[in-house]
Amino acid sequence: MAGGQIEKLVKYKSTVKDPGTPGFLRIREGMLLFVPNDPKSDSKLKVLTQNIKSQKYTKEGSNKPPWLNLTNKQAKSHIFEFENYPDMHACRDFITKALAKCELEPNKSVVSTSSEQLSIKELELRFKLLRENSELQRLHKQFVESKVLTEDEFWATRKKLLGKDSIRKSKQQLGLKSMMVSGIKPSTDGRTNRVTFNLTPEIIFQIFAEKPAVRQAFINYVPSKMTEKDFWTKYFRAEYLYSTKNTAVAAAEAAEDEELAVFLKPDEILARETRHKIRRVDPTLDMEADQGDDYTHLMDHGIQRDGTMDVVEPQNDQFKRSLLQDLNRHAAVVLEGRSIDVESEDTRIVAEALTRVKQVSKADGETTKDANQERLERMSRVAGMEDLQAPQNFPLAPLSIKDPRDYFESQQGNVLNVPRGAKGLKRNVHEAYGLLKESILEIRATGLSDPLIKPEVSFEVFSSLTRTIATAKNINGKNPRESFLDRLPKSTKDEVLHHWTSIQELLKHFWSSYPITTTYLHTKVGKLKDAMSNTYSKLEAMKESVQSDLRHQVSLLVRPMQQALDAAFHHYEVDLQRRTAKSGERPNGYV
């Protein structure tokens, strides 16, 4: 071990069954690096310490080799087999210290730098909010000054109050204009045949979005082979040749100029995207069946500008492009909108950003072999047409309804068919009546020896209920629209509202702290739990302190607050038991 790093000879395994790739492991405080002995091997690994979620290791003395299994935050495992246990323990201890340091440094920076980097304007805004809102000031004093919450935690949930200007600012992205790229008109000087195109960043973005081949050509040619001005000159020369519909001239110039041919030939990148989309279409949708509905082949129908009726030599067919293709592509790009949010005057940056976005979307859209198979199976199931299937005769249970009223009124028509001793039922009714009559006569003669409730207690309860009901009717009759909260004394009402606001604040921070992944969150949840317990006790004391005729209604007001706190307490206890049991099952840290 030298300075702030450690190096050991290990074997790297991507899975447990992997035989392993020999090499050396170098660990620093911020990074873990594995370099294989074979330079041609692709098992080189680089992991940031802050991305390591957990580490597991084999217990010394077991029959297993010394393995150290590191799991990152993406749930991917990296297994290292060491030559001996001391080397493994040395690396494990080094990683543990590095993880602890990575965990403490962000927390320290949040506490120290956030207050230092606060501008005077932000501090003035906070003080202004506290002065204008007495309830906010009371919450701040209750939780921040008592150190239940830090200053940053308290204001983190009130970003809307601190950033009203950002709220007023529209977050909607600007779309693309509906004007087509082919509609860009040049300006002329009136004396020569020279034309000038005025290219804005928006026009360039639209060209790159509609024509991937032009975007890729810009990345390949500018500035290595030509300047940006020469590039756009060739592009608009190609557009001019398209507009003349003279495919012979276009083919001749493309044969002489290799760079110009890129703009004149069909867009292969766009063609690949189209083929990929077609493969994902349900094969039961037969587009050829709709060709009979096409009227463009009839006289006086169709788009004459489309060029579909022009006679073109077969060898020049690749230099032909229809208006319909341009319209469809332009419509697709306009509907897609701006896929990137880059505001730069550098055309190359825009082109590269668009290319990266397309590559990411392509990677996301690629389906695996299993997913492809599932899609084909789903299509085969959908392809089955109901009118061509054999009739499905499901087994039916015949209904036996003697009287329709038995079915519609009691739905017990079949029950009547089962003999269940109707005569015995009638005889039992007479016996039960006789027994009840004898019991009543006996009670009249001797009385109840052991009453269920003492008469004094029952009289007191009924009297109290009578007074409460009479009072409630009297109060409710005065102002039906008035709520019970308005009838409470002002001090009690303010206390109830403050408790409700405090509980909302505590629960907001409590639930946002889960899952507990750091010591900082564990400490924060403990403070919040103690504060909620204190609030719970205050609620109980408040219920006992109110007048007896208001106690029931106050209990109804307080009950939702206590239920919310009980749910938080239950979650805290369950999570604590789970973490305690989990740590108890792994005394050596190995799962």
Swiss-Prot record:
Residues 112-166, 191-243 form the BSD domain. Component of the general transcription and DNA repair factor IIH (TFIIH) core complex, which is involved in general and transcription-coupled nucleotide excision repair (NER) of damaged DNA and, when complexed to CAK, in RNA transcription by RNA polymerase II. In NER, TFIIH acts by opening DNA around the lesion to allow the excision of the damaged oligonucleotide and its replacement by a new DNA fragment. In transcription, TFIIH has an essential role in transcription initiation. SUPFAM superfamilies: BSD domain-like, PH domain-like. Component of the 7-subunit TFIIH core complex composed of XPB, XPD, TFB1/GTF2H1, GTF2H2/P44, TFB4/GTF2H3, TFB2/GTF2H4 and TFB5/GTF2H5, which is active in NER. The core complex associates with the 3-subunit CDK-activating kinase (CAK) module composed of CYCH1/cyclin H1, CDKD and MAT1/At4g30820 to form the 10-subunit holoenzyme (holo-TFIIH) active in transcription. InterPro entries: BSD_dom (IPR005607), BSD_dom_sf (IPR035925), Tfb1/GTF2H1 (IPR027079), TFIIH_BTF_p62_N (IPR013876). This is General transcription and DNA repair factor IIH subunit TFB1-1. GO terms for biological process: DNA-templated transcription; nucleotide-excision repair. The keyword DNA damage applies. PANTHER family: TRANSCRIPTION INITIATION FACTOR IIH-RELATED. It is found in: Nucleus. Its main location: nucleus. The keyword Lyase does not apply. Belongs to the TFB1 family. It comes from Arabidopsis thaliana (Mouse-ear cress). Keywords: DNA damage, DNA repair, Nucleus, Repeat, Transcription, Transcription regulation. One of its GO terms (cellular component) is transcription factor TFIIH core complex.
